[in-house]
């Protein structure tokens, strides 16, 4: 009896059985990659996928983003049926595209269309990093260019939410050409007095950051978003210097004058509404033929 009182405590934790793990369905809980807090996924979704503990902005898919900024039921999609081919016959590219279509229920890495924010009509494009890491191929570039042209025709503002790893390597020079095509479309829109708001989310890199993402009349970003062209390691090896810890973050770019504002997701719709309201009937709304 007395001997039982002095038995050494076990120094290990019991690992739950496979059956116990199966009792918690997939998707019920989400772990924050920043603070490691585990929370109910429903709670996270209710908070616009912003961690309730540390404020980390989890990635949003295209439909979640549209729901968070547009008036309910106002969105009308453009060019839904456009799909990428494999013009360079890159190995396994078609299989990867098909896999992403099934996984995301999207045909490509961007969703474009029109909708309203507080009854103000806008054309909007939202990139979805779940599809080929949001990379820009021929179809992504074409859909964005068409959306800008639609904004030009309707004489309404164009808003884009970027989330991309850059140009799509499987399409080579055809992918790089989209940088010029989208930029030219935006120049035409701008010359006519059209308003363009670019919102950079995590991550916005490569050819996307070096083209249309940085051309906004207003360049906004979400907190903590990674924004840059080349990767940190490549830059450090090139300049042979250690870069600041916050290098290529939205906050770093704001401090160095490359962004107009870093906007919390809770405030994004209201911030866009205010910008649109300021330009209603103003100089930017005077269109030139």
From Swiss-Prot:
One Gene Ontology molecular-function label: acetyl-CoA carboxylase activity
Cofactor(s) essential for the protein: Zn(2+)
GO CC, one annotated term: acetyl-CoA carboxylase complex
Pathway assignment: Lipid metabolism; malonyl-CoA biosynthesis; malonyl-CoA from acetyl-CoA: step 1/1
Keyword Magnesium set for record: no
Domain annotation CoA carboxyltransferase N-terminal: ranges: 28-289
EC number assigned by the record: 2.1.3.15
Record keywords, A-Z: ATP-binding, Cytoplasm, Fatty acid biosynthesis, Fatty acid metabolism, Lipid biosynthesis, Lipid metabolism, Metal-binding, Nucleotide-binding, Transferase, Zinc, Zinc-finger
Enzyme kind, highest EC tier: transferase
Locations listed in the record: Cytoplasm
List of residues binding Zn(2+): 32, 35, 51, 54
Pfam families named in the record: Carboxyl_trans, Zn_ribbon_ACC
Cofactor binding summary note: Binds 1 zinc ion per subunit.
One GO process term, biological-process aspect: fatty acid biosynthetic process
Catalytic reactions on record: N(6)-carboxybiotinyl-L-lysyl-[protein] + acetyl-CoA = N(6)-biotinyl-L-lysyl-[protein] + malonyl-CoA
Zinc finger (C4-type): 32-54
Subcellular location, principal: cytoplasm
Keyword presence, Glycosyltransferase: no
Function: Component of the acetyl coenzyme A carboxylase (ACC) complex. Biotin carboxylase (BC) catalyzes the carboxylation of biotin on its carrier protein (BCCP) and then the CO(2) group is transferred by the transcarboxylase to acetyl-CoA to form malonyl-CoA.
Alphabetized NCBIfam families for the sequence: accD
Family recorded in the similarity comment: Belongs to the AccD/PCCB family.
Subunit structure: Acetyl-CoA carboxylase is a heterohexamer composed of biotin carboxyl carrier protein (AccB), biotin carboxylase (AccC) and two subunits each of ACCase subunit alpha (AccA) and ACCase subunit beta (AccD).
This protein's name: Acetyl-coenzyme A carboxylase carboxyl transferase subunit beta
Encoding gene per record: accD
């Amino acid at each position: 009896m007395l001997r039982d009182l002095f038995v050494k405590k076990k120094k290990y934790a019991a690992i739950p059985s496979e059956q116990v793990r199966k009792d918690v369905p997939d998707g019920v809980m989400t772990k924050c990659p920043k603070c490691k807090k585990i929370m109910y996924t429903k709670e996270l979704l209710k908070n616009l996928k912003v961690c309730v503990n540390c404020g980390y902005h989890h990635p949003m898919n295209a439909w979640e983003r549209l729901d968070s900024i547009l008036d309910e039921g106002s969105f009308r999609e453009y060019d839904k049926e456009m799909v990428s081919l494999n013009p360079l016959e890159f190995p396994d590219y078609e299989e990867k595209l098909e896999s992403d279509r099934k996984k995301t229920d999207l045909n490509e890495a961007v969703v474009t269309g029109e909708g309203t924010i507080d009854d103000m009509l806008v054309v909007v494009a939202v990139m979805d990093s779940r599809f080929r890491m949001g990379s820009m191929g021929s179809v992504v570039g074409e859909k964005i260019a068409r959306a800008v042209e639609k904004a030009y025709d309707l004489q309404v503002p164009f808003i884009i939410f970027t989330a991309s790893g850059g140009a799509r390597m499987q399409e080579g020079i055809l992918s790089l050409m989209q940088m010029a095509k989208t930029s030219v479309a935006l120049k035409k829109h701008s010359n006519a007095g059209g308003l363009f708001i670019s919102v950079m989310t995590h991550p916005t890199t490569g050819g996307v950051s070096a083209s249309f993402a940085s051309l906004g009349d207003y360049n906004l970003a979400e907190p903590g978003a990674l924004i840059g062209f080349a990767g940190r390691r490549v830059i450090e090896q090139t300049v042979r210097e250690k870069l600041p810890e916050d290098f290529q973050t939205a906050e770093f770019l704001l401090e160095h004058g490359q962004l107009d504002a870093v906007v919390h997701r809770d405030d994004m719709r209201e911030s866009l509404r205010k910008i649109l309201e300021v330009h209603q009937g103003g100089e930017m709304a005077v269109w030139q033929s």
